[in-house]
A protein has these predicted regions:
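Acidic metal-coordinating catalytic centers involved in nucleic-acid phosphodiester chemistry
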Residues: 1-8, 57-261
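Catalytic centers of nucleases
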Residues: 3, 10-73
Length: 261
């Protein structure tokens, strides 16, 4: 049971990240979005870049140690880009314990809770090892946003589906069973491209890719997300109900494959 729950949590974590990718792209207003860049998502405007790391720990109580490592990584990036216009954001969902984090962050709190740690029995003070002054840490903190009250898996997914319905003026069934699987497929393809330039996209290009895809899509990941009987019922209602005389070729469904005649 524990193994199964862990596997489910892992899958939900991936979906949570994919949904965040899609939301960042669809909510963007002229920015370029890079997936798996400096962080999970980089939002690049004409004047600055915000590097966002996403953490989804549905079964984990928040502790400072849970976010300390990604913050240390951000500090290392900051060390070599102090004069650049980078901002950093840690966006996370946790079961409980959020009241342990006092905001706004202070230099001493960040140094003590996030940048001081033990590794293999040795105590480290990362700010000292990186030769960063309190003024440097203060600048870093001013560029750092920590949000550990992120939306739940369900709420974020509902927001994405709502945005899909509004943007394409479609039904809930169409949003869930056509647009959402297609968006997942496109996001995954972008995020896993080995060339960083290809992992950068703007909203207009992303929308054009969706519009260009005319055929219904059965996404393997999406099929795993819901029970197969529920999925089949939705697809039948969407494409087959009240369409008794449908051309048999229109009934073909494949994993992103086109029907060629």
């Amino acid at each position: 049971m524990t193994h199964t729950r862990t596997a489910i949590d892992t899958i939900r974590g991936y979906y949570y990240q994919f949904d965040l990718y899609a939301l960042q792209i669809l909510e963007s207003k002229g920015e370029n979005i890079t997936l798996e860049g400096i962080e999970d998502v980089d939002v690049n405007s004409a004047t600055e870049t915000t590097a966002i790391q996403c953490k989804y720990y549905e079964g984990t109580t928040y502790n400072h140690s849970v976010i300390a490592e990604p913050i240390r990584w951000m500090l290392k990036h900051f060390k070599t880009h102090k004069t650049d216009t980078f901002k950093y954001k840690l966006y996370g969902f946790y079961k409980d314990g959020q009241d342990k984090l006092m905001l706004p962050l202070t230099v001493e709190f960040v140094k003590d809770k996030f940048l001081t740690f033990k590794e293999k029995g040795t105590k480290h003070k990362l700010y000292s090892e990186l030769e960063l002054s309190d003024a440097d840490i203060s600048l870093f903190v001013s560029r750092l946003e920590v949000d550990i009250n992120a939306m739940s898996f369900v709420k974020q997914n509902e927001l994405l589906l709502k945005m899909i319905r509004q943007y394409w003026n479609c039904s809930q069934i169409e949003a869930e069973n056509f647009y959402y699987p297609l968006i997942l497929k496109l996001v995954r393809e972008i995020a896993t491209d080995k060339i960083e330039e290809n992992r950068t996209i703007d909203k207009d290009t992303f929308i054009a890719k969706i519009i260009a895809h005319k055929n219904p899509l059965v996404d393997i990941w999406f099929a795993k997300k819901c029970a197969s009987n529920e999925y089949c019922k939705s697809m039948h209602k969407m494409y087959f109900s009240n369409r008794i005389n449908m051309n048999p070729y229109e009934r073909f469904f494949g994993s992103g494959a086109e029907v060629r005649g």
